[in-house]
């Protein structure tokens, strides 16, 4: 058999097979019937004669049938007219007894004129006369033959009737029949047996489908064709039960046994956690169709609820067992719980939705097969209709008469005061009219349109004063004919009752307010009683109410089931995440910073070469022994939080309502908040102690990602900047899942700003609280003192002579004693301090700290803000600007700290050079060169410039430092020169001081500003109005006053001299002109030394 036959056999129409045992062939069982038939034949007198009709039939079979050939007896027409086809031939044939002359003339010769008819009559008379003559001639010519035939017939009749020939023939036939019976009786009995066997085979072939059903059902089950198995099972029960044959009961028992095993298999599939969703749907749908049977699962009830409850019990048991596993750390248990939830709950929820809605999807292959059958049936119907139409057209063409289809105008009214008119014939139905009317509406998914018969009847009251209108709406069936209804209403023509068609949606209510006549007035009275009758309305309403109640109950049960699972999962995860007895996660405590401090210290190791190696910004390397790695803990926290968020998003993605997810939403929020606080606190704490990792290593390696990224204008930074940026980025990356939760970002932003500010604290600690930096001043002074002693010994310079006033000398003595005590204490501290590295001195470390601070202010803070925006897709607030402003203040403080240290060293040189250098300002010769202490100071400034460029390579910082030192240099020179006793100052001494000032101004010309210009003018005025006599008169007689009073007194003398406006004979302009050649000569000699100051 072909594959098509096999496929069709799976869905055979078993209704065609019936058990009919009376349907057998009837054949004679004995030859006695033949004998009886022969006797009857002999007794029949007409048996040997052939009737005239039979003879005409036999002759007609041999001859050509020309009865359809047209012949006009009048000889006028050769072709029949169209009207003749619809008239009976008996009425037109002259030889027929029912010939009608009127019909002949009206149908055949209706268009023939009178002249032709007259000629035809003559011809007809001639033919009649000639035919009579022919008959007479025939009889005359063959008269002898007629007489002989008559005599022969008489003789044959006498011979048969008078002789015994017929009896002898009858006896011979009887003998033949008896002998045939003897011979053929066994054959006939065998034939009867064969017929009985054939009948049994026929029945077996007819009901072979029933016998094959057990095997077919088993084959369908093996191939997972559950729909076919259910189809065959139901049809087998129908056929066997309707036949009521005991022979088929055994087959039915076998089928029931197979079905029971199939039910057990389906229930086991429902209880198996690895069963896929499609298989679950098929299993539940199959069980709902074939029932639970009579076995162990007969009392289960609804198979879908059995699956839901079984799966619920399995999930809750697994969650409890997993959460109580003490062999795994908490973060791994949380991971297993999340995997368990994601692998079971989605399928459980989807099946629950089908359970609530009370429907399951059908098998696509089975539906496709049914659709193909329907399409084939429709095609066959269309072919039949086309053939019928062709036949009708051919009949109409043959008859020459086309019948016009009758039709009527049908007016359909709508609720929006409009109506439509359609032409309907007898073949159109109500469903066709509905399709025409619904084209004017915009349909929605749930719309259902109906056509109603609107009947209106007015009833007068007994006193005939009021009239009540009764309106009745009757829904029309789709098979009714609008043509017949319209004709019926037109034929009645009743004045007391009106009918019309109304088209509307089924859920729309019909009221008298929305029914208006064409003129705008209401058709119905306000007292109209409206009754709407729908097809099967009461049954549909009852079914809808029961379905709604069942769905609500199922939804409540299933909702509680899902909520219980979510609450159990949330409680276990929260308990594991916040369990204080475990060491898997760090908890908030008062000693958190101290623990982190110890951890950072423990992760710092020194190799044999003295180079420090430490962990990255994310938490450092591993400690020793039992030390917990905070980086691993944070990673585990990130994984757990992401797993819980993934569970939440996946459950939301499958359409689970928020009511079901309330517990997991609360869990997610709690974990996220705790995780954010933990990560932010770790980030701030790590940044707070980064100064411990400062080993003053320069970012010179090209492999370092931050070697060029964090440098401003080519400034050099240390690897501490990389540690800082890595720490921030690593911790922020752990919070990347907050990109779609902008409401939680303010705390992260605040923590980022706090971390940047904490890094500023680290820089402040490195700049101001480091003991090695505190010793910078003393190191510089000691080195300067040693250099000067060596220089004096080599050059043979005379010892220092103090030319200051007695008060100033006493004050200097006190200052020296105090400085000696401070220096002794700091030296002791310096001996006890330890350094991580000796590669950079204290000044260079201070410059590197300044460079790091400038980098944070100028670039790193902006880069971190960009990283934050790119990571979370949210802008930052204005708090970061305030933090940058604070760091800018710190940058200026560090710069001033460095400048003050250098100014202190330069100020000591100025004090020694002006007051204690051993030279005198009371000379009589003109100056020839710049003072040596000025050259020493400028040389120190060259060293400062070189130190800045070598250490941090910053032109801006070097410019700012030199400019500030330049200002301090002028202020200090003016102040110290004002402390010199005027008795020891001559005009030549003033010229020497003016030469020094001019030399400094020319060398540092590029670093001048308004302040230096003012200071230079003040110095010139001091020299111009300095008068020794006035200085003596204003000197205080008492020498026991403090140094502060002395300074105020000298200042008052300076301003009193200015107020007098007198002069001492010293001309600034002339002196400057005289000193110009000497100045140029000294500048040329030192141009190479001070070339770094030329910008």
Swiss-Prot record:
Pfam families: Sec5. Residues 616-626 have a biased composition (Gly residues). Its main location: other. The keyword Transport applies. It comes from the Eukaryota. Keywords: Exocytosis, Protein transport, Transport. InterPro entries: Cullin_repeat-like_dom_sf (IPR016159), EXOC2/Sec5 (IPR029175), EXOC2/Sec5_N_dom (IPR039481), RA_dom (IPR000159). One of its GO terms (cellular component) is exocyst. One of its GO terms (biological process) is Golgi to plasma membrane transport. Residues 807-833 have a biased composition (Low complexity). It is found in: Midbody, Midbody ring. Residues 7-25 have a biased composition (Acidic residues). Residues 1-32, 605-629, 804-835 are annotated as: Disordered. Belongs to the SEC5 family. PANTHER family: EXOCYST COMPLEX COMPONENT 2, EXOCYST COMPLEX COMPONENT SEC5. Component of the exocyst complex involved in the docking of exocytic vesicles with fusion sites on the plasma membrane. This is Exocyst complex component 2. It comes from Dictyostelium discoideum. The lineage of its organism: Eukaryota, Amoebozoa, Evosea, Eumycetozoa, Dictyostelia. The gene is exoc2.
């Amino acid at each position: 058999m072909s594959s098509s036959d096999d496929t069709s056999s799976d869905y055979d129409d078993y209704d065609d097979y019936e058990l009919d045992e009376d349907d057998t062939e009837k054949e004679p069982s004995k030859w006695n019937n033949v004998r009886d038939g022969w006797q009857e034949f002999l007794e029949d007198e007409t048996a040997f004669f052939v009737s005239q009709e039979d003879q005409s039939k036999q002759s007609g079979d041999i001859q050509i049938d020309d009865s359809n050939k047209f012949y006009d007896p009048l000889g006028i027409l050769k072709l029949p007219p169209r009207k003749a086809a619809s008239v009976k031939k008996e009425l037109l044939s002259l030889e027929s007894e029912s010939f009608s002359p009127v019909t002949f003339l009206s149908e055949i010769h209706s268009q023939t004129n009178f002249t032709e008819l007259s000629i035809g009559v003559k011809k007809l008379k001639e033919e009649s006369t000639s035919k009579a003559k022919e008959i007479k001639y025939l009889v005359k010519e063959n008269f002898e033959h007629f007489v002989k035939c008559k005599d022969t017939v008489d003789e044959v009749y006498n011979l048969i009737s008078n002789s015994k020939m017929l009896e002898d023939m009858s006896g011979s036939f009887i003998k033949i029949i008896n002998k045939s019976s003897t011979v053929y009786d066994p054959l006939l009995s065998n034939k009867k047996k064969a017929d009985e066997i054939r009948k049994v085979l026929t029945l077996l072939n007819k009901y072979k489908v029933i016998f094959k059903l057990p095997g077919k059902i088993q084959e369908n089950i093996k191939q997972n064709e559950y729909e076919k198995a259910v189809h065959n099972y139901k049809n087998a029960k129908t056929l066997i039960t309707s036949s009521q044959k005991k022979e088929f009961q055994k087959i039915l028992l076998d089928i029931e046994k197979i079905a029971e095993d199939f039910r057990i298999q389906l229930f086991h599939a429902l209880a198996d956690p690895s069963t896929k969703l499609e298989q679950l749907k098929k299993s539940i749908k199959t069980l709902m169709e074939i029932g639970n049977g009579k076995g162990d699962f007969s009392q289960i009830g609804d198979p879908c609820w059995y699956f839901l409850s079984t799966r619920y019990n399995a999930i809750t048991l697994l969650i409890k067992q997993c959460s109580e596993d003490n062999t795994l750390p908490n973060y791994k248990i949380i991971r297993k719980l999340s995997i368990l939830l994601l692998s079971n709950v989605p399928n459980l929820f989807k099946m629950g939705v089908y359970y609530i809605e009370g429907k399951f999807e059908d098998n696509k292959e089975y539906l496709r097969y049914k659709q193909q059958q329907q399409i084939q049936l429709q095609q066959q119907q269309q072919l039949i209709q086309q053939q019928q139409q062709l036949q009708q057209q051919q009949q109409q063409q043959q008859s020459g008469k086309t019948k016009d289809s009758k039709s009527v105008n049908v007016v359909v009214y709508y609720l929006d005061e409009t109506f439509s008119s359609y032409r309907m014939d007898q073949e159109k139905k109500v469903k066709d009219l509905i399709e025409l009317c619904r084209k004017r509406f915009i349909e929605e998914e749930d719309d259902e349109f109906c056509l109603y018969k609107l009947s209106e009847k007015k009833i007068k009251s007994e006193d005939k004063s009021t009239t009540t209108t009764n309106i009745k709406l009757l829904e029309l069936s789709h098979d009714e004919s609008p043509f017949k209804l319209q004709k019926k209403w037109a034929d009645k023509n009743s004045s007391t009752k009106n009918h019309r068609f109304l088209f509307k949606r089924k859920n729309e209510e019909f009221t008298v307010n929305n029914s208006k006549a064409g003129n705008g007035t209401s058709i119905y009275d306000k007292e109209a009683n409206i009754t709407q009758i729908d097809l099967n309305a009461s049954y549909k309403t009852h079914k809808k109410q029961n379905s709604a109640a069942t769905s609500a109950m199922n939804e409540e049960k299933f909702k509680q089931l899902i909520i219980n699972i979510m609450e159990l999962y949330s409680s276990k995860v929260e308990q594991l995440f916040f369990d204080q007895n475990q060491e898997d996660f760090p908890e908030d405590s008062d000693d958190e910073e101290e623990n982190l401090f110890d951890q950072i210290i423990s992760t710092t190791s020194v190799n044999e070469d003295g180079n420090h190696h430490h962990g990255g910004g994310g938490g450092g390397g591993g400690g020793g022994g039992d030390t917990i790695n905070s980086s691993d803990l944070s990673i585990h926290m990130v994984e757990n939080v992401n797993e819980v968020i993934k569970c939440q998003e996946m459950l939301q993605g499958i359409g689970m309502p928020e009511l079901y997810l309330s517990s997991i939403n609360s869990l997610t929020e709690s974990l996220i908040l705790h995780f954010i606080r933990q990560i932010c606190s770790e980030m701030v704490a790590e940044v707070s102690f980064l100064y411990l990792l400062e080993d003053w290593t320069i970012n010179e390696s090209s492999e370092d990602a931050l070697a060029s990224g964090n440098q401003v204008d080519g400034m050099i930074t240390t690897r501490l900047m990389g540690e800082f940026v890595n720490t921030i980025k690593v911790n922020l990356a752990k919070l990347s899942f907050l990109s779609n939760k902008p409401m939680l970002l303010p705390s992260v932003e605040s923590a980022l700003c706090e971390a940047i500010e904490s890094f500023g604290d680290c820089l402040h600690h490195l700049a101001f609280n480091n003991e090695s930096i505190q010793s910078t001043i003393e190191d510089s002074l000691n080195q300067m003192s040693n250099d000067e002693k060596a220089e004096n010994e080599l050059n043979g310079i005379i010892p220092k002579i103090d030319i200051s006033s007695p008060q100033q000398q006493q004050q200097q003595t006190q200052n020296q004693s105090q400085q000696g005590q401070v220096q002794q204490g700091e030296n002791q501290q310096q001996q006890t301090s330890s350094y991580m590295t000796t590669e950079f001195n204290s000044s260079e470390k201070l410059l590197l700290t300044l460079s790091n601070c400038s980098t944070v202010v100028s670039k790193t803070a902006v880069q971190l803000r960009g990283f934050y925006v790119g990571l979370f897709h949210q802008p930052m607030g204005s708090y970061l600007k305030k933090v940058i402003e604070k760091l800018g203040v710190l940058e200026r403080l560090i710069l001033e700290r460095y400048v003050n240290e250098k100014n202190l060293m330069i100020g000591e040189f100025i004090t020694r050079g002006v007051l204690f250098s051993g030279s005198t300002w009371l000379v009589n010769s003109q100056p020839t060169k710049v003072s040596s202490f000025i050259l020493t100071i400028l040389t120190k400034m060259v060293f400062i410039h070189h130190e800045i460029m070598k250490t941090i390579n910053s032109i801006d910082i070097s410019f700012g430092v030199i400019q500030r030192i330049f200002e301090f240099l002028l202020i200090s020179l003016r102040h110290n020169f004002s402390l010199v006793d005027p008795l020891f100052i001559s005009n030549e001494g003033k010229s020497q001081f003016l030469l020094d000032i001019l030399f400094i101004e020319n060398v540092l010309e590029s670093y001048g500003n308004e302040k230096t210009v003012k200071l230079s003018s003040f110095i010139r005025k001091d020299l111009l109005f300095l008068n020794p006599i006035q200085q003596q008169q204003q000197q205080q007689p008492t020498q026991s006053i403090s140094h502060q009073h002395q300074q105020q007194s000298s200042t008052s003398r300076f301003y009193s001299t200015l107020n007098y406006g007198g002069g001492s004979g010293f001309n600034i302009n002339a002196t400057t002109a005289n000193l110009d050649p000497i100045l140029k000569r000294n500048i040329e000699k030192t141009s190479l030394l001070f070339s770094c100051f030329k910008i």
